[in-house]
Amino acid sequence: MALLAAATLNPTTHLSLRSRAGRNSENLWLRSTASSQKSKGRFCNLTIRAGTPSKPAEPIGPVFTKLKPWQIPKRDWFDKDFLFGASTSAYQIEGAWNEDGKGPSTWDHFCHTYPERISDMTNGDVAANSYHLYEEDVKALKDMGMKVYRFSISWSRILPDGTGKVNQAGIDYYNKLINSLIDNDIVPYVTIWHWDTPQALEDKYGGFLNRQIVDDYKQFAEVCFKNFGDRVKNWFTFNEPHTYCCFSYGEGIHAPGRCSPGMDCAVPEGDSLREPYTAGHHILLAHAEAVQLFKARYNMHGDSKIGMAFDVMGYEPYQDSFLDDQARERSIDYNMGWFLEPVVRGDYPFSMRSLIGDRLPMFTKEEQEKLASSCDIMGLNYYTSRFSKHVDMSPDFTPTLNTDDAYASSETTGSDGNDIGPITGTYWIYMYPKGLTDLLLIMKEKYGNPPVFITENGIADVEGDESMPDPLDDWKRLDYLQRHISAVKDAIDQGADVRGHFTWGLIDNFEWSLGYSSRFGLVYIDKNDGNKRKLKKSAKWFSKFNSVPKPLLKTTNNNATMTAASVSV
């Protein structure tokens, strides 16, 4: 996976007004373009468009509510070149963990060695069996009218030992997948690494804790460029490095499962205040080396793009105070800026340098030059938002995890006692579409408005949800996606350069430490019927949504006006 604005709208006239309203109590049919807290209340900038329906929009409220027909996003709200697609990752769907010469990954080792660390004691040995059923995945994409499929390459399927001899069977598998996508008019977007480092490198030198990983990753990336670059024109070097570093080396709940002694994790032999930054530093150096190689040898004609996919979370101040406003800024730095700031400007955010001290490694001048402006495209993986609450920097508070370093706690409930949005089937995801709009506007206003793709966005169905007894009737997912697609359009209307939206995920998959208890797919995987693929309600909606003939869609107009009212309030 699977867990910040003034608009110029053309050509319609519009009226802006300021209205005092609660976060979940807005009963107008309009779009929230910005919000800020003032004394004794919350103000929202609201834009009313001429010619749109006069009926009120349904507020999100504390629980899920289905949208009215006129609130549902339409494909012609977006430029014809805007890409809708879906995402997956290798370990979560492929299975065939030891077939055809594949070597074990850190996730193979983690699940086999510490099965109790997975909520349902499962693993990715078979997963959705996409290694054998990839054509069914391609068919599902085509049935939904999706134009893009973002998937990842299993490092240990290509290089079983992490380096050295290439496994031709692995190359053949990805060639077949890529060719099948292209034959069905679906564009492949490839993530080179999505958390599944070869276990051989973990055993040899500690994986991303050792600088040797930089050279070995570069070799792996070159194998990918050399074998697939004639057809793959869009690459992401790394997926969600922030979550990886925090969960794998801070809390230790993901492979390789390291944390400080005395903490509860699989391998309590690490340093939760230092190792996340060491691993993250090596990820950034590996990214820079791979990008330099790519641009020097494999993109001479300039027709390909490369970047990184960042996990991001939106933040609002816990209450109307200077300290919580500052806490919000630090939270954004530590969540989004940790990896984004270096690939834009060449170094970590100032707040991180100030608070972390010598635990945060330094870049050389040469490394900074390689990192700065190293992304042609950027991916944002957005699921949810939080309130950010200041934590006093006092002797009474001592950080124990790297996530404590921001001196800001992440809260699901604000000072008024209200949740930031309705909770979804997955405990950590609260629906807050405005958070996505806000982050896209940060990309525009703070980071130079680079081309951005929403590379992951979605929620999970969970076992035992009585409101959704039929696994194919995923109306909550549909509502969530519709509201977030509208939130993307909000940002586009305000000038953000957003190029696509990829739902997480294409199919139900192995959801890391949650196993198969959380189902994020547009497509249901029937484990009792040979992993048979079945389209859910959300998938069938995309089939209709994407059915608009391309000649009827607009061309290159990021400020195109919506044809229906926004619902991302």
Curated annotation (Swiss-Prot):
Catalytic activity as recorded in UniProt: Hydrolysis of terminal, non-reducing beta-D-glucosyl residues with release of beta-D-glucose; DIMBOA beta-D-glucoside + H2O = DIMBOA + D-glucose; DIBOA beta-D-glucoside + H2O = DIBOA + D-glucose
Binding-site residues, a beta-D-glucoside: Q92, H194, N239, E240, Y383, E456, W504, E511, W512, F520
Transit peptide per record: 1-50
Coiled-coil region: none
UniProt KW keywords: Chloroplast, Disulfide bond, Glycosidase, Hydrolase, Plastid, Transit peptide
Activity's dependence on pH: Optimum pH is 5.5.
Organism: Triticum aestivum
Protein family per UniProt: Belongs to the glycosyl hydrolase 1 family.
Function per UniProt: Acts in defense of young plant parts against pests via the production of hydroxamic acids from hydroxamic acid glucosides. Enzymatic activity is highly correlated with plant growth. The preferred substrate is DIMBOA-beta-D-glucoside.
Protein known as: 4-hydroxy-7-methoxy-3-oxo-3,4-dihydro-2H-1,4-benzoxazin-2-yl glucoside beta-D-glucosidase 1b, chloroplastic
Disulfide bonds: C259-C265
Pfam families: Glyco_hydro_1
Keyword Disulfide bond: yes
